[in-house]
Curated annotation (Swiss-Prot):
One of its GO terms (molecular function) is amino acid binding. Heterododecamer (2C3:3R2) of six catalytic PyrB chains organized as two trimers (C3), and six regulatory PyrI chains organized as three dimers (R2). This is Aspartate carbamoyltransferase catalytic subunit. Its EC number is 2.1.3.2. It comes from Gluconobacter oxydans (strain 621H). It catalyses: carbamoyl phosphate + L-aspartate = N-carbamoyl-L-aspartate + phosphate + H(+). L-aspartate binds at K89, R172, R227. Carbamoyl phosphate binds at R61, T62, R111, H139, Q142, G268, P269. GO terms for cellular component: cytosol. Pathway: Pyrimidine metabolism; UMP biosynthesis via de novo pathway; (S)-dihydroorotate from bicarbonate: step 2/3.
Length: 313
């Protein structure tokens, strides 16, 4: 009888995790999604546990989603405001780690502009660490919620063609999704301007690069649109928003190139009229609102499973 995958202590990224290690997160999240819809989520799974949300970058969806997830499981949730904390007064990340460690929190959710910051914290604190997005590196819970959304519609997470379009080069969401989707044996197409499409990504598995958006969408089961991350861009990578939409915007004509009923996804926030047309974002094929809903369920599952790793045997 095969051994069951062990419960991880941290969730720092998707890279290196097998499909067998990822499925338990998705299965538990599925059950939490059903319970949340019936308003009967277990309120005591994290009772007596403390979750600290430490966000060095602005966030609405992810921080709120983690806060709801912790509270629905009965945890004490603390949102640390970096703008008014000692961090803003010059405290280093390692000093912050020492302070948080002294507070004896159980789970630490971290978003940081620097790639690798959550991994560094995980080596310095006793708490379980969840990466809520680090630089351009990874955003593992976003990939999990995207995977759950896809699985709910197709009944499987294998053998699909997924087109990820837009600012791939600066996207931690794209990287985590590439690792997850290829782990399950899917075909991934990356589409965008050559300036935003690093060639190294072709070496991440069953991945194809396209500078022609139309070709990338032909026969796709899922189309995932990404926003232009201007805060991480240098000058001149994209001539103008109008020109970008002309060549790489997801509109009705382009969506028709994908398979009938193909899912339309976006991690948010959306720039309507830049990477996606409003009538596509609001269409029956769009599952963008469902992604947000699944985000809470996935984060409940992540906090729950990581907390079990801290329980004595």
């Amino acid at each position: 009888m095969p051994e069951r995958p062990s419960v991880p202590r941290h969730l720092l990224g998707i890279e290196g995790l097998s499909a067998e290690q990822l499925v338990p997160f998705l299965d538990l999240a599925e059950s939490y999604a059903l319970l949340s819809r019936s308003r009967s989520a277990p309120r005591d799974a994290l009772r007596g546990r403390t979750v600290i949300n430490l966000f060095y970058e602005d966030s609405t969806r992810t921080r709120t989603s983690f806060e709801l997830a912790g509270k629905r499981l009965g945890a004490d949730v603390i949102n640390m405001s970096v703008a008014t904390s000692s961090v803003n007064k010059g405290e280093t990340l390692l000093d912050t780690a020492a302070t948080l460690n002294a507070m004896r929190c159980d789970l630490l959710v971290v978003r940081h502009a620097q790639s690798g910051a959550p991994a560094l914290l995980s080596r310095k604190v006793e708490a379980s660490v969840v990466n809520a997005g680090d630089g351009t590196h990874e955003h593992p819970t976003q990939a999990l919620l995207d995977a759950l959304t896809i699985r709910r519609h197709f009944g499987r997470l294998e053998g699909l063609t997924v087109a990820i379009c837009g600012d791939v080069g600066h996207s931690r969401v794209a990287r985590s999704n590439i690792h997850l989707l290829t782990a399950f044996g899917n075909r991934v197409r990356l589409a965008g301007p050559p300036t935003l499409l690093p060639g190294a990504m072709a070496g991440l598995g069953n991945v194809e690069l396209y500078s022609d958006m139309d070709r990338a969408l032909e026969g796709a089961d899922v189309v995932m649109s990404l926003r232009l991350q201007k805060e991480r861009m240098g000058a001149g990578l994209v001539p103008s928003a109008r020109e970008y939409f002309h060549f790489f915007g997801l509109d009705r004509r382009r969506l028709a190139l994908a398979k009938p009923g193909a899912l339309v996804m976006h991690p948010g926030p959306m720039n309507r009229g830049v990477e996606i047309a409003s009538d596509v974002a609001d269409s029956d094929q769009s599952v963008i609102s469902e992604q947000v809903e699944m985000g809470v369920a996935v984060r409940m599952a992540v906090l729950d499973r990581l907390s079990r790793a801290r329980m004595p045997a």
